[in-house]
Amino acid sequence: MPKIVVVGAVAGGATCASQIRRLDKESDIIIFEKDRDMSFANCALPYVIGEVVEDRKYALAYTPEKFYDRKQITVKTYHEVIAINDERQTVSVLNRKTNEQFEESYDKLILSPGASANSLGFESDITFTLRNLEDTDAIDQFIKANQVDKVLVVGAGYVSLEVLENLYERGLHPTLIHRSDKINKLMDADMNQPILDELDKREIPYRLNEEIDAINGNEITFKSGKVEHYDMIIEGVGTHPNSKFIESSNIKLDRKGFIPVNDKFETNVPNIYVIGDIATSHYRHVDLPASVPLAWGAHRAASIVAEQIAGNDTIEFKGFLGNNIVKFFDYTFASVGVKPNELKQFDYKMVEVTQGAHANYYPGNSPLHLRVYYDTSNRQILRAAAVGKEGADKRIDVLSMAMMNQLTVDELTEFEVAYAPPYSHPKDLINMIGYKAK
């Protein structure tokens, strides 16, 4: 009976183990998770903090006991894999509660350890990062125990923006700082202006090109020379892959600690697969490497690896499109395709349109800005971005499907929209992009 060991029990690892069990009722499957919880919804965490998700239990899909009862898969939390011996096909495991170490053998090894939040490195009792449900609980408990009012949010990526919005909606008073003027980097820089407008509208203070210089209790000294007092600091300054323990093996790592995989999510070492934030692959629509640490990729990889292990060796990953979206107060920001800083590798043209998300005479209309970049040599779409109060998600998902099927920008004129006045136009924004490109 084959023995499958999975490292990490969140989106990628738990999903992969579950899919294997669906296809294979006999294999012995064991998951090691270094933290307290398994199968929690990472993307729900800011909304748990904001009390939009009314009960944290809704963010926790399974406990180890429930997972075993349903699927006959053993999950050991507080068990950290600290080394891999791929020649003997074993992993070294640390029980974080007892400090005992032991070795576990495997026939197949699936690595899904995820990423950890970067820290600014200040010694302070008021600083927090947000990576898992334990962090969420700590933030929530600190807010309640200390009657927190003023919160400094450091960083302006999509998670920080979600956290800031949820703190505000909870009734707290957040301030945002970011070390450069480049916020929400997955979006075109000039399309991020509504973020600043939404902050101004709510009189939420923010400073770009600003950093913390020192923390002394609740007194924060900034690089600008300003000194301010805050009850709490939440750092959202990026992540790094949890790959240190992999250095003990023969698995190839890139210079940033990510693991290159093939289209079966195999590493360079036999019988070892990698899924989730730690894996790096390639784009689907262009010949460039891609690392897309988002939920869809982890779930897709989990299914492909499960199929491979269950015996379907014909299934392969065709690449990322990098589809992403974030809500910030009244606006939605979405994009798909290569990142803005990767466009310089192509000879491209850009076409854009701004018009109402639905028929102008129907109430509640608001502008939607849609932009498409296409390759001048074959006129295929390289990237698209959309910003608006409604309809951005629909347009980006349609363009994602167009890119998946290698449609040209001209073929967007043939897109048949589901039209009624509350939803769109007879000639939709996507059609208009195609016409303008001609």
Swiss-Prot record:
It is an enzyme of class 1 (oxidoreductase). Its cofactor is FAD. Substrate binds at residues 15, 19, 22, 39, 42, 71, 299, 427. It catalyses: NADP(+) + 2 CoA = CoA-disulfide + NADPH + H(+). GO terms for molecular function: CoA-disulfide reductase (NADPH) activity; flavin adenine dinucleotide binding; NADP binding; protein disulfide isomerase activity. Transmembrane segments: none annotated. The active site is at residue 43. InterPro entries: CoA_disulphide_reductase, CoA_disulphide_reductase_staph, FAD-bd_OxRdtase, FAD/NAD-bd_sf, FAD/NAD-binding_dom, FAD/NAD-linked_Rdtase_dimer_sf, Pyr_nucl-diS_OxRdtase_dimer. It comes from the Bacteria. The keyword Ligase does not apply. Its EC number is 1.8.1.14. Keywords: FAD, Flavoprotein, NADP, Oxidoreductase, Redox-active center. FAD binds at residues 8-33, 267-277, 419. NADP(+) binds at residues 151-166. It holds the Pfam family Pyr_redox_2. Binds 1 FAD per subunit. Reduction of disulfides occurs by a thiol-disulfide exchange reaction, but involves only a single catalytic cysteine residue that forms a stable mixed disulfide with CoA during catalysis. NCBIfam families: CoA_CoA_reduc, PRK13512.1. Homodimer. Catalyzes specifically the NADPH-dependent reduction of coenzyme A disulfide. Belongs to the class-III pyridine nucleotide-disulfide oxidoreductase family. This is Coenzyme A disulfide reductase. It comes from Staphylococcus aureus (strain MRSA252).
